[in-house]
UniProtKB/Swiss-Prot annotation:
Residues 1-22 are annotated as: Disordered. It comes from the Eukaryota. It comes from Conus ochroleucus. Disulfide bonds: none annotated. This is Conantokin-Oc. The mature peptide does not contain cysteine residue. GO terms for molecular function: ion channel regulator activity; toxin activity.
Length: 22
């Protein structure tokens, strides 16, 4: 659903940020 997709996007963004920081 929408909430699920939103959570997925948040997780992906978090992962991307971590990769950039590392």
């Amino acid at each position: 659903g929408e909430e699920e997709r939103k959570a997925m996007a948040e997780l992906e963004a978090k992962k991307a940020q971590e990769a950039l920081k590392a």
